[in-house]
Amino acid sequence: MKNKKLLVMAGGTGGHVFPAIAVAQTLQKQEWDICWLGTKDRMEAQLVPKYGIPIRFIQISGLRGKGIKALLNAPFAIFRAVLQAKKIIQEEKPDAVLGMGGYVSGPAGVAAKLCGVPIILHEQNAIAGLTNKLLGKIATCVLQAFPTAFPHAEVVGNPVREDLFEMPNPDIRFSDREEKLRVLVVGGSQGARVLNHTLPKVVAQLADKLEFRHQVGKGAVEEVSQLYGENLEQVKITEFIDNMAEAYAWADVVICRSGALTVCEIAAVGAAAIFVPFQHKDRQQYLNAKYLSDVGAAKIIEQADLTPEILVNYLKNLTRENLLQMALKAKTMSMPNAAQRVAEVIKQYSN
């Protein structure tokens, strides 16, 4: 009997791509074939084939920040992308399509509707992006990570890597820690410039009380090392973190942005967090962070309010006991079966 096939529509950032990979791998274990639809110039083009998943491309890009010419050409570009996606769908003959966000999802979702293929949509953020708002009107089923993006969609969490759930629980991790509090600073793959420029001034005041690890992002090690100056030996600086599960588990508290995937990873491992949301116009990261801050698992410091003094005052008053309580609360908010639940819905609605 022929295997069923899923076409994944996701691209642009890790927040869209990694959860989609988790769902794809879940279905691969159940004898499903997977094909990916993306764009050639975004991260999925290099990343997805490393997981043994074939990928095909359409031409589409975002309009934010583009000039008037791009806006005038947009209807033609979208129409062309829909036709390209329709041709690929007719060739691949998927039993369902999964939309996980990114520019590619829009025209590909419309093409799937035209071809009569069931559309399962997953919104990773606490507020839906424009593409998913529009696709939500034609999707067969809409799922969401947080309870605030769509009024009536099922809340399933964000599919995250399984190794995060395999870490010991916070009370076990914290049980033999008596040394300095451990602070992990995560800037993400691009690095968070505001964190890179603020933390050296924080470490200068707290290096004798706290232990720091700082992931600074691509190409930023030299610049940030210079900012640390004479305190450089007091902090471990890395460009990337290869083993995020281990890094989260090492930390007593994590300072980071609050992208949807990061928030769900922190919940999965059970870690206390200080979130500095990126200043989106739609407050996307702030609303993601509230998922944990509202239950006392995290502290939010708005970027406009972030100063070395505010961070120093907050950090120096922390104890391992209150960080453990925050970590335990974060763990209660995790949804370990997100990838499996999305996979179940895909199977339920597939042709």
Swiss-Prot record:
Cell cycle as UniProt keyword: yes
Functional pathway: Cell wall biogenesis; peptidoglycan biosynthesis
GO molecular function, one term: undecaprenyldiphospho-muramoylpentapeptide beta-N-acetylglucosaminyltransferase activity
Pfam entry (one): Glyco_tran_28_C
GO cellular component terms given for this protein: plasma membrane
CDD domains: GT28_MurG
Function noted in UniProt: Cell wall formation. Catalyzes the transfer of a GlcNAc subunit on undecaprenyl-pyrophosphoryl-MurNAc-pentapeptide (lipid intermediate I) to form undecaprenyl-pyrophosphoryl-MurNAc-(pentapeptide)GlcNAc (lipid intermediate II).
Protein name: UDP-N-acetylglucosamine--N-acetylmuramyl-(pentapeptide) pyrophosphoryl-undecaprenol N-acetylglucosamine transferase
Organism, scientific name: Haemophilus influenzae (strain ATCC 51907 / DSM 11121 / KW20 / Rd)
Gene this chain is encoded by: murG
